[in-house]
């Protein structure tokens, strides 16, 4: 396999694996290890009621929880993923042999 292909693809795969892992851990994605929906539950839940902690205030929280995916999440992904891809492509061009 060409090193440049691995250099460009690896950040995308890395981001995908950790996104799926943490959203599964936080019970946002309710999928089996093979990526199939579990029986009897919705495969995706956008609202999550986070556990009480010192960081989360006890008053003024919505009863259904906070949305997991927001405009800010979309903006970070819309800017971050292409940036990583672009930097990987530039780095891959450094190893081009003529």
Curated annotation (Swiss-Prot):
Compartments, record wording: Membrane
TM region(s), chain numbering: 5-25, 73-93
One Gene Ontology biological process: photosynthesis
UniProt xrefs under Pfam families: Cytochrom_B559
Transmembrane listed as a keyword: yes
SUPFAM superfamilies, per database record: Cytochrome b559 subunits (SSF161045)
Membrane topology of this protein: Multi-pass membrane protein
Protein's UniProt name: PsbF-like protein
Source species: Prochlorococcus marinus (strain MIT 9312)
